[in-house]
């Protein structure tokens, strides 16, 4: 989806935790009336319209492992194991889960009888979409963020972009458009997701910088932001053993509308 260039830096300082809280009513997005297509990690998946799954009192949930290393994870929702053996940087397709108050639990793959390494409580709303991210917080502890996916289309001729900062040792991040040095996002804290933002649809190069600094740590080249599409840039790594990396996710509403709405 785009090319990465990592620039070595020294003296990276972690910021204090600003964790996301998964609560009822935290999402203002409406269920989509169209199916969605997702491209991530070279794989494409399709999910039904939000309004279609709402008729069954279900929500749409996908899982991303943003914890650098070799550990693969299983994710549970209440008593059901919903995703298994998910490796680092892998994004699962959307799956339908009950729209209810419940508990997400994260375990190393295959360790079903052990205590979870992270827990997140909250409510899934009928017909809405969520990305659950396994990451480390600013103190290096495993955590789960349940992030609403507002896949309402961007303005005419625009693309939408958001950033998730899962690089726990990197600290605050700025994302800058290289061509005109325009900040798209500033001061994105660790363990935080921005809202989607409308941007010009164009091929561009983006720089990721430590908050308030002028020198890029990561350059994202050949970023082709297409009109009507929605992009998530997940920052991860940035440790002594794993360089700062970006996991790109591309979503779009398909032309077809699910029947039975």
Predicted features along the sequence, with ranges:
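Sec-dependent bacterial lipoprotein signal peptides
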Residues: 1-24
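Intrinsically disordered, low-complexity polar regions and short flexible loop motifs
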Residues: 26-261
